[in-house]
């Protein structure tokens, strides 16, 4: 019996939709590049995660534009943004929100925490106690929060960008494997190159780096982004590439050089990321190179 590969692994994407998507993504990347010097790889990976409906763990020292990248991206895609700084004394209610009695109405009002946004920047996630981390990871996994018997669901556009300092720094703790598995990708933001740093200095010297985010106009609306994101479901993946992903995962589980093999969740993450990354490159089909590229970041998140 002949199998319909399009039905199994993706449908044909109309060229008009693909062209519109490519134009929007190129404009988005261009606008980010006009504000942030370098970090093109990081920008591609963050956009890939958003398109794949996943979360990102970003490791890097302070001062490499992690916060600016998150705020700017949210602004350009017309998304609600929030930020929470994780500290050793942070409580779950500081992240999720809390119920407060309103004496005027004689009722309890729920005050939403920072997790109720579209793009959430969680700074220094590896400085918070385990209980607070667990509250966040439950929301990441379930995309909903249960507070005082009421369940609050997150919107369709929901990506957490969590940053962590290198574990060698004082007061940091290595995240457990089960928690790393909640991230689609792990990215390391490097220092700028010499030429990039000179460019940064020139921008600051001439005040060209002074950008008011509130004055920046979105490139795309949330509704448009969600509509275009559905194109990832139509990206074609040949059966041989599915076998390729499965083979990679199997080999990590038998190799003595790997501490903990890739889980099935990691295999799915690799597939989702590869489809989104292919679309970001203007293609409606996945290549082996897409998988090899995404492997560097999806496997690191799941099996660090």
Located regions from the model:
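Conserved ASCE P-loop NTPase core motifs with emphasis on AAA+ ATPases
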Residues: 2, 6-31
């Amino acid at each position: 019996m002949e199998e319909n590969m399009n039905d199994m692994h993706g449908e044909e994407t109309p060229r008009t939709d693909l062209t519109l998507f490519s134009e929007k993504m190129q404009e988005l990347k261009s606008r980010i590049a006009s504000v942030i010097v370098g970090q093109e790889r990081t920008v591609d990976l963050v956009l890939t995660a958003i398109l794949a409906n996943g979360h990102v763990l970003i490791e890097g020292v302070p001062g490499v534009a992690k916060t600016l990248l998150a705020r700017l991206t949210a602004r350009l895609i017309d998304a609600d943004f929030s930020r929470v700084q994780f500290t050793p004394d942070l409580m779950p209610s500081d992240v999720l929100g809390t119920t407060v009695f309103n004496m005027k109405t004689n009722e309890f009002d729920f005050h939403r925490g920072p997790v109720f946004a579209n793009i959430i920047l969680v700074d220094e996630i590896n400085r918070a106690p385990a209980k607070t981390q667990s509250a966040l990871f439950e929301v990441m996994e379930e995309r909903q929060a249960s507070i005082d018997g009421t369940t609050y669901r997150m919107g369709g556009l929901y990506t957490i960008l969590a940053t962590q300092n290198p574990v060698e720094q004082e007061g940091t703790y290595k995240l457990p494997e089960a928690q790393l598995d909640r991230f689609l990708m792990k990215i390391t933001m490097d220092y700028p190159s010499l030429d990039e740093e000179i460019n940064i200095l020139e921008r600051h010297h001439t005040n060209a780096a002074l950008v008011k985010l509130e004055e920046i106009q979105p490139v795309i609306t949330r509704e448009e982004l969600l509509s275009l994101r559905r194109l990832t479901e139509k990206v074609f993946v040949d059966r041989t590439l599915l076998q390729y992903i499965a083979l990679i995962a199997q080999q990590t589980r038998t190799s003595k050089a790997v501490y903990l093999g890739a889980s099935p969740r990691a295999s799915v993450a690799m597939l989702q990321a590869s489809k989104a990354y292919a679309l970001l490159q203007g293609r409606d089909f996945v290549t082996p190179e897409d998988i090899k590229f995404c492997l560097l970041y999806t496997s690191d998140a799941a099996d660090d």
